[in-house]
Amino acid sequence: SKEVILGLSMHELEDNLSDYFAIGDKMKTKYYLNISTLNLIFETVGSESEDIRAKGTAFYRNNEQQCAMSLKYIENENEVIPLIRLPEMYYIACEASDDVTESARYVNTVRNKRGISKSKDVACDTHELRIAALYKEYRKEFYGEGQYFWFLKTHGITGTLVHCPEVTLVEE
């Protein structure tokens, strides 16, 4: 991708991952999600339905089994695992900015590039609104990537993940 700033090159990436991801009628892997979860995560219905991150060839959809699987690592002709991409730089700038207008501009730049209309731009007038906007964008932009986990951990977000139970860790 033209947006990868730093990544790892993995020789024969597709071959190495194909055992973990089965597409087509088999879908024997656990690395898939049901269609309703895909629609919830990527807001495919309603005001953000034009978001390209869940359209086209981003996911393999098996409508008969009502499940979908991300193709970001399977169909990766450059054999690159991204470590940092341009959208993440915009999100970091959004979070770091003290200016609410500038902060919103950073997050909305990515949203607009992903096909979401400027009329649906989000506001970052408070810290809570900024984190809420970034939460939704990290969830979509970094689906299946460590950056999303890092964002959740950094902000202490627990128990709010789609189809993930809340777990209390006890120090022993």
Predicted regions and their residues:
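Acidic/polar-rich alpha-helix caps and helix-coil junctions
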Residues: 1-23, 45-172
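Short, cationic low-complexity segments
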Residues: 27-42
